[in-house]
A protein has these predicted regions:
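A short, compositionally biased
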Residues: 783-784, 807
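Glycoside hydrolase catalytic-domain context in secreted enzymes
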Residues: 1-772, 778, 785-794, 813-815
């Protein structure tokens, strides 16, 4: 459809129809205008797979590795292939827009959404996310809602905006979602600064800006470039509010036309005007080629951080008995929580993968070793609803106090429900009651947990109990369990999408299971085995969108049961290998006692197979850390300035400025604050030589001109493997301005057979040498001598060659 066609269509819309298109119809779809054959558009989460409309028990979907795992590959081509596959998956859910990727720069290791994002480095984030977006489009947190983030213009430009700038200029995404929080005193959608001046004017972006499930203002958002409010139905853009703003002149119809035009352009981009049929049914399509891609990508992202005595890969010929231990040994931790959660086609746990790969050739013994519950598991056994069917009866009432007759009833087999996808139309006030008859099979003082999105009460045989309780049950007796919940009074200052929503979870664990001595059992099994594999990490309860982590440690934070497990097992067996599944670094107090350590991230539905491929040597680990790994949280640049729960002002000051990640740790090298593992670090089963580095071209008269580093890389070992050549630039000193010691300029990954050698070329341009000059609001390259480091990590010991070039005349350029 031409621009003229879109303008004609715009003129045919009535004012009320245009206002309707300013916001969504429901949680995932926009309005259709049948009179003009304008179709509805469906969007879907998330960054690691197309989940579909149902948040709970939805149509099965394919779960890909998290973006932090993808970042560890340093592989642009792989990111493009993942994007292509996600485009195909999006279509199976009847959607035309995938709400991903997340490209926030990692500022703190306790950020709850780090796993969804790529890296602490804006260049690595921007280049890999660009390929992800290009591939996708080729086919078709702690009170983050109100926090005011105070950031210098230089830090914004050099660190936090840079990855977005790279993506916009390289991949031209069709949609961008805005954040909830303020930046320097203003909500993102309440000022023309970001959406209009930076995105559209400076960078020339022409896509659609939508809210990340909640917006803060009607007038400001319409005037300042926010095109679509999601989810629907409209709240801040309700028809009466927009008409009122039009009447008193705070918003013009021209403003509305600009917003609707962007929406129509998006419909055209995704082909909806060629495919005007109603939203297709969601389908579960499990493609073998996507299975293989996920397994490949998951293994490529695994980072080997320790391999004492070459304990890995496991020598199956000499190993007779392997202990598989840990809370995540038989639990496939495929993804983090929040938008990344989904109902997968399947998930392979490490224990399942070991058994399927080695069969009877090796004896396996298993122990869970530690409990890491935050909320206890669902109560599934021995529960009967009032109708006599297994499960729970849920009754919904049109007030806050369970008065009158329920307007809807449901039966669920799980002890969890949410109205986010259970009821399409909800009253202005609502409460619910969930009941069951519970007949336990064993006696004991069993454990229960309760959580809810509003005021929630648990009754057992009519008695009110606390949120987390132990209750003495007799085997075979019947107990009436009742949960009552009323609607939360959610506001923008809390959790926008939970306004007028109800969610409840009841958890249960028998006393015998909770109180067993897991540590002793694990130690005994480890002692009698040739090698002990300990699988640790986070679950969706501990690492999720919507909440930051309470500490840079393995959970539970109070008991530290996972750390105790590793220490106990390593004391029993020196051949202990830890495989950790988290989206961020954690403290490693046991590291000196473990023989091996793999960081596996969230590798998707093939996670167990990907881990097995690396442990058994079928895949040579080539992952590199996309962030620095601190020894303790106190060593990070943002310590004391992350989150604001203890601050009345609700302000977070980015006092570290541009010194994020390795830019910070470079200041502290060879001190007690030196990073435990540097950015870009990762071990291999083979060895590499990096020699004969040279440099060509260093005059940048335009953005198109590049400088090329050529280097010879040889595989000097006896296994095929891959190395990542990382090129860093060290700028000359500037009086009165501190710059990072070095910054990543570019990188390249090379795959080599044993004894093979290749020449690798790595290009970078003037952006790599520039800093943001706040005095003139331009990028500036100063004259002087620049040092180029050719390295295999950001650590000084991993620099393989030093080159230099001279800039005789400085230059400035616009964003």
């Amino acid at each position: 459809m031409t621009s003229a066609d879109l303008n004609t269509l715009l003129t045919e819309l009535t004012l009320d129809e245009k206002i309707l298109l300013l916001a969504g119809k429901n949680f995932w779809e926009t309005h259709e205008i049948d009179r003009l054959s304008i179709p509805s558009l469906k969007v879907t989460d998330g960054p690691n797979g197309a989940r579909g409309a149902q948040i709970l028990d939805g149509v099965p979907a394919t779960c890909f590795p998290a973006c932090v795992s993808l970042a560890s590959t340093f592989d642009r081509q792989l990111a493009y292939r993942i994007g292509q596959a996600l485009g195909e998956e999006t279509q199976t859910k009847g959607a035309y827009v995938l709400l991903g990727p997340t490209v926030c720069v990692h500022r703190s290791p306790v950020g709850g959404r780090n796993f969804e994002a790529f890296s602490e480095d804006p260049l690595l984030t921007g280049t890999l996310a660009s390929e992800y977006v290009r591939g996708l489009q080729s086919e078709q947190e702690t009170r983050r809602f109100v926090v005011d983030e105070i950031i210098s213009e230089r830090a914004i430009r050099e660190i936090y905006l840079k990855s977005f700038e790279i993506i916009v200029k390289q991949a031209e995404p069709w949609c961008i979602m805005t954040a909830y929080n303020k930046v320097n005193g203003h909500y993102i959608d309440a000022t023309p600064r970001w959406l209009t001046e930076v995105l559209r004017h400076e960078w020339g972006w022409e896509g659609l800006a939508m809210t990340d499930w909640g917006a803060g203002s009607c007038v400001e958002s319409v005037r300042n470039g926010l095109d679509l409010e999601m989810p629907g139905p409209a709240r801040i853009r309700a028809s009466d509010l927009v008409h009122e703003a039009l009447k008193d002149g705070r918003v013009s119809e021209s403003d509305i036309n600009d917003r609707v035009r962007r929406f129509l352009q998006l419909l055209d981009h995704v082909g909806k005007f060629c495919d005007r049929k109603t939203t297709p049914e969601e389908r579960a399509v499990d493609k073998p080629e996507h299975r293989a891609l996920i397994r490949e990508a998951g293994a490529a992202g695994i980072v080997m951080l320790k391999n004492r005595g070459n304990i890995l890969p496991i020598d199956v010929a000499s190993v007779k008995r392997i202990a598989i231990l840990g809370p995540l040994a038989d639990v496939p931790s495929a993804h983090g929580g929040g938008s990344a959660s989904m109902t997968c086609h399947y998930k392979i746990s490490p224990a399942e993968a070991r058994a399927s790969r080695l069969g009877n050739r090796v004896e396996f013994v298993y122990s869970k070793g530690a409990h890491i519950y935050r909320a206890l598991p669902d109560l599934l056994e021995g529960v009967t609803a009032a109708s006599g069917t297994p499960g729970f009866l849920i009754e919904y009432f049109e007030d806050h106090n369970l008065q009158g007759q329920p307007f809807e009833t449901q039966v669920t087999t799980r002890s969890y429900f949410t109205t986010l996808d259970q009821i399409e139309i909800k009253p202005r006030a609502m409460s619910a009651r969930m009941t069951t008859t519970f007949r336990p099979t064993e006696a004991g003082s069993h454990y229960l947990s309760l959580s809810g999105t509003g005021p929630t009460k648990l009754f057992i045989n009519g008695e009110l109990d606390e949120l987390r309780v132990r209750y003495s049950f007799e085997a075979g007796m019947e107990y009436e369990v009742r949960i009552e919940i009323s609607m939360p009074n959610a506001t923008i200052a809390d959790i926008y999408i939970l306004d007028k929503q109800l969610s409840v979870h009841l958890g249960f664990v028998p006393q015998a299971e909770m109180d067993q001595n897991l540590l002793h059992e694990a130690a005994e099994l480890a002692r009698d085995s040739d090698i002990a594999l300990v699988f640790t990490g986070n679950t969706t309860q501990w690492e999720s969108e919507g909440q930051d982590m309470e500490a840079m440690t393995l959970p539970p934070y109070d008991t530290r049961t996972q750390d105790k497990l590793i220490e106990t097992v390593a004391a029993a067996n020196p051949n202990t290998v830890v495989v950790n599944t988290t989206g961020s670094p954690v403290e490693l107090p046991w590291l000196n006692n473990a023989a091996g350590f793999l960081q596996a991230w969230y590798a998707g539905q093939e996670t167990g197979n990907s881990i097995a491929d690396v442990l058994l040597g079928d895949v040579n680990p080539s992952g590199k850390l996309p962030m620095s790994w601190p020894r303790v949280y106190e060593d990070t640049a943002c310590y004391g300035n992350f989150g604001f729960d203890s601050q009345v002002s609700k302000r977070v000051e980015y006092v570290e400025g541009v010194f994020v990640g390795y830019r910070h740790f470079d200041r502290h090298w060879n001190t007690d604050k030196q990073a435990l593992y540097p950015f870009g670090f990762g071990l291999s089963y083979t060895t590499f030589g990096v020699t004969d580095a040279s440099l060509e071209g260093a005059v940048w008269d335009s953005d198109a001109q590049t400088t090329t580093v050529s280097v010879s890389v040889a595989n000097t070992g006896d296994r095929a493997g891959a190395e990542v050549i990382q090129v860093y630039i060290c700028p000359p000193a500037i009086e009165g301005l501190e710059r990072p010691v070095k910054e990543l300029a570019s990188y390249a990954k090379v795959v080599l057979n044993p004894q093979e050698e290749k020449v690798v070329k790595v290009d970078f341009g003037r952006d790599a040498a520039a800093y943001w000059d706040e005095a003139v609001n331009k990028w500036r390259v100063v004259p002087g001598q620049y040092t180029v480091l050719v390295a295999t990590s950001s650590a000084p010991d991993d620099v393989k060659s030093r080159l230099s070039f001279e800039i005789s005349e400085g230059l400035t350029f616009d964003p």
